[in-house]
């Protein structure tokens, strides 16, 4: 499959604290921000049907960078993290030096680990280039079963394979997925995330058919999502053997939808100022 790694979705409970962490600590930029009056048809915001918002944040254009999607549900002000998400790996000398001067812990391979306000961990390593998201690490209950799903069913190439972990990618230079054998059953709790990829639009239906033939899990069958004032996007939502959610979108519509909005951070800050949901829920 000619797929492209796009982003990972986090549910966040406090937008003000979260945006400060990502912009001031990880030095990311707000790329676009969207507000919605009701829940997403493809459960983009989780199992909620109230008002919500989506903020894309990262180190550059979504055409060229793997970024993050921060989902905020107005009625929800706390999520419980499970053991499904492990970490996101970012390398940069500049960022490494900065993190070394603030509260952190040392992780494996010489990286420094920090957490966002909701507890999502990031591992920062040294590299002579601007900050870049290199890898998403997810825990799995059965490494062989997961490897077979991602490699054989979804077509991700194996980059490196070790006894307790496998690194996969849809192509050179793309953000990798690293699946890591967990010593316990995967419990995603309420703070579960979602990883997203794009495919040429005409390949989405064949992908869905392939998953059905293999008796794989389809959370949302192929549908078209509308964003007010922006491009429509086709999506199909899958789940791997550990129920990690996987979104595949039509690449053509998504490239149009995902253009950088220079006014996004200003709009987000204004929405944060107006948000009085804690008084109501």
From Swiss-Prot:
The keyword Amino-acid biosynthesis does not apply. Residues 4-127, 132-251 form the VOC domain. Keywords: Repeat. PROSITE patterns: VOC. GO terms for biological process: determination of adult lifespan; methylglyoxal metabolic process. InterPro entries: GLOD4 (IPR043193), GLOD4_C (IPR043194), Glyas_Bleomycin-R_OHBP_Dase (IPR029068), Glyas_Fos-R_dOase_dom (IPR004360), VOC (IPR037523). Thought to act as a glyoxalase. May remove methylglyoxal from mitochondrial proteins. Has roles in reducing oxidative stress and increasing lifespan. PANTHER family: GLYOXALASE DOMAIN-CONTAINING PROTEIN 4 (PTHR46466:SF1). Belongs to the glyoxalase I family. This is Glyoxalase 1.
